[in-house]
């Protein structure tokens, strides 16, 4: 079971509109597909992809993380908590964020 904190869902929704508004994608549907690819990666990989322990300075994001490389310039870091087969997605940042330099 995978659960997303409300803030993560809000972030992904905002991301779609920001990518479209800044013309990274010419169509809103393309921006939605981009966000869907991140979600698909989480849904299909979180239980098989080797997770890493989050550095102490970023523990407020979540105790573990996995990463998804969406293209040559951008890597997405997905933070979470888990117990057995239950996962709580607590935060998502990308390699362009200041905090990513600590990963």
Show the residue positions of the predicted features.
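Enriched for short, Lys/Arg-rich terminal
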Residues: 68-103
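Basic, Lys/Arg-enriched alpha-helical interface segments
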Residues: 1-65
């Amino acid at each position: 079971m995978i659960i997303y904190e409300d803030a993560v869902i809000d972030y992904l929704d905002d991301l779609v509109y920001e990518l479209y508004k800044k013309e990274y994608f010419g169509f809103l549907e393309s921006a939605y597909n981009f966000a869907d690819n991140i979600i698909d990666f989480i849904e299909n990989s979180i239980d098989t992809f080797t997770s890493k322990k989050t550095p102490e300075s970023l523990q407020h994001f979540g105790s573990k993380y996995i990463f998804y490389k969406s293209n040559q310039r951008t890597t997405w870091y997905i933070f979470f908590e888990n117990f057995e087969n239950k996962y709580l997605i607590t935060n998502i940042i990308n390699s362009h964020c200041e905090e990513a330099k600590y990963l």
